[in-house]
Amino acid sequence: MEIAMLELLIGLVVTFAVGYFIVKGYKPAGILLTAGILLLILTGILGHKVLPGQMESTGNLLTDAMEYVKYMLQNRGGGLGMQIMLLCGFASYMTHIGANNVVVKQFSKPLSFIKSPYILLVAAYLVACLMSLAVSSATGLGVLLMATLFPMMTAMGISRPAAVAVCASPAAIILSPTSGDVVIAAEKSGLPLHVFAVETVLPVSICAIIVMAAAAYFWNQYLDKKDNTPMEKVDLSEMEVKSPAYYAVLPFLPIIGVFVFNGETLPGITLDIYTIVVLSIFIGVLVDYITKRFNGKQTLEDLEACYEGMADAFKGVVMLLVAAGVFAQGLMSIGAIDNLLHLAEVAGAGGIALMLILTGLTVAAAIATGSGNAPFYAFVELAPSLAAKMGLNPAFLIIPMLQASNLGRTISPVSGVVVATAGMGKISPFEVVKRTSVPVLLGLVTVIIGTMVLVPMHA
């Protein structure tokens, strides 16, 4: 018991230290990486396995910590990191060839009757939530929205922090009935997938999204006034648009590709986001080449903007993701998350109190680790046995936990989606968290109330 409390205390102290130094202006990537390596080394000193189960030890706790950094560079640098770099490169290329300006010019005309940028913000948020049905990865969706919707939102008068928050938050509430989290939750609840996803989770999700959209309207309006946030609305009369009108389609090619190459629209053809973005860049280059009357030299010079955008993404976003991953592994390997689980088991509370405890612990773990999946997968294992002991409906415990893990990720300064969108928007992750905090907290309250009203407590 004493060792368990020590492990939890170490996790809390290091987490608070990370927050302190980042607030003081230290570079987040360096702080997170240092804290993660420290936690991994302390894990070895306490006698635990430093590396996750699928990795073999190097034989030394110090080199094990370095081995995990290498693993994250390969895994996130070459996986999710490559996706981010491709999308950032694509976005930079679209800006360079003038396609984003064409989009703003074209879309501003029909939307000019909407005078409030905050109504546009709500509309963008609802569109982004629908996009989560097609793109299951929170970070992938956030980066995709930053590459496509973000330039248009800021040009139409939505402040940069508010626009980043919109891109970071659509995956906070799960809508997709085929999401891996939903499938596991349905299994643990003992309900058929269609009953759990459509009849149980979906009504709660819709209520939460409506509340979060309204909260985003008022909260961002309040913060913009309070912080005197500069608006970047473009004066259309002064906007220089040299590219032809059909360039307006180009920035949306990745989004179009997600729907076209999903294996159903064109049966037999399924492409992942990496290939879709590469194809989008290729189409953009081809269109630009034809538009410039087959001036190959100029077209290839313009393409350099794509490579520069990818390089900037590695420095500003991907290394942050790597560092955040090392930090999250440090927290998990030292036992901080397992000890939170133990607290839930020994709490011995009533139905509603137990649901609140499990939900609170899931949110706390999601904020600390930056992961929406890991806390839920860990805590959901407890729900069926706890529900059986107390005669509760497992779904009553699981639905708030399911949504809480994703909501918690959206207010974590070390989560992939917050780090990635903040990096692309060139603002602090803490600014994103500030913008998403009130909508997320109200969304969580809505989920809890919705569960209590719509889901039977007892089996």
From Swiss-Prot:
InterPro entries: C4_dicarb_anaerob_car, C4_dicarb_anaerob_car-like. It catalyses: fumarate(in) + succinate(out) = fumarate(out) + succinate(in). The chain crosses the membrane at residues 3-23, 28-48, 79-99, 118-138, 139-159, 164-184, 195-215, 243-263, 267-287, 317-337, 347-367, 437-457. It holds the Pfam family DcuC. GO terms for cellular component: plasma membrane. GO terms for molecular function: antiporter activity; C4-dicarboxylate transmembrane transporter activity. It is a multi-pass membrane protein. Its main location: membrane. Keywords: Antiport, Cell inner membrane, Cell membrane, Membrane, Transmembrane, Transmembrane helix, Transport. It is found in: Cell inner membrane. One of its GO terms (biological process) is C4-dicarboxylate transport. NCBIfam families: DcuC, DcuC_1, PRK10654.1. Belongs to the DcuC/DcuD transporter (TC 2.A.61) family. Responsible for the transport of C4-dicarboxylates during anaerobic growth. Catalyzes the uptake of fumarate coupled to the export of succinate. This is Probable anaerobic C4-dicarboxylate transporter DcuC. It comes from Vibrio cholerae serotype O1 (strain ATCC 39315 / El Tor Inaba N16961).
